Curated annotation (Swiss-Prot):
This is Stress-response A/B barrel domain-containing protein DABB1. The gene is DABB1. Keywords: Cytoplasm, Plant defense. One of its GO terms (cellular component) is cytosol. Homodimer. It comes from Arabidopsis thaliana. It comes from the Eukaryota. The keyword Cytoplasm applies. InterPro entries: Dabb (IPR013097), Dimeric_a/b-barrel (IPR011008), HS1/DABB1-like (IPR044662).
Length: 210
């Protein structure tokens, strides 16, 4: 498989006044969607760490993969997906989604069990040229030691992206591997800082058992 579609959704759930059972029900309902024919990989869970230059306070994350935009669209309108979305409306305070094409699919479509996912979303400054966008994505593709897989791409679904236009997701073996490359990633950020208006970084744990 040469390319895949990456689909990332960030949720802010109103967990202050909501029965935790409703949150668990939503998360479990989303994770059951992995059984749909269109889905190559899907995981939803709580955010371990959120780093952002704005006041965003998302609490949960969904990452899923598809063969094509058509499969993503079919997933979006599938009755099971529509039902889960409708059932969770009352506990969602905020939501955003970013989709991109990974031109080279990772060898393993499902990340290793027990690994740590790291999503980076960028909102670029106005009038950033196409050449600069390509440069940004090349910088973000740099694969440090400890990264099992990484994809980067330009968002093609602006409707719910809050103007974030570039996304990347990488999977590390554990938190220690992320901490080990912190300095390298800061240098990476310095290379693209002049083009970036806002950044959201999300880290989350992939369960150690399926």
């Amino acid at each position: 498989m040469s390319s895949i579609v990456e689909h990332v959704v960030l949720f802010k759930l109103n967990d202050d006044d909501v029965d935790s059972g409703k949150i668990n029900s939503m998360v479990n309902g989303i994770n059951e969607l992995v059984n749909l024919d269109q889905v190559l990989h899907l995981y939803c869970g709580s955010i371990h760490r959120l780093i952002t230059t704005t006041a965003s306070d998302f609490t949960h994350v969904l990452h899923s993969r598809y063969r094509s935009k058509e499969d993503l669209n079919a997933y979006a309108i599938h009755p099971d997906h529509v039902r889960v979305v409708k059932e969770s409306e009352s506990i969602r305070e905020d939501i955003m989604a970013v989709d991109w094409i990974a031109e080279q699919a990772p060898e393993a479509l499902a990340p290793p069990l027990g690994s740590i996912g790291k999503i980076t979303l960028l909102k670029l400054k106005e009038n950033v040229m196409e050449e600069a966008k390509l440069e940004i994505m090349e910088v973000m593709k740099e694969k440090f030691e400890g990264i099992d897989q990484i994809t980067v791409g330009e968002n093609f679904s602006p409707g719910r992206s809050k103007d974030f236009s570039i996304g990347s997701i990488s999977y590390f073996r554990d938190l220690g591997e992320i901490e080990a490359v912190d300095d390298q990633m800061k240098l990476q950020n310095d290379k693209i800082r002049d083009y970036v208006d806002d950044t959201i970084v999300v880290e989350f744990n992939v369960p150690s058992s399926s």
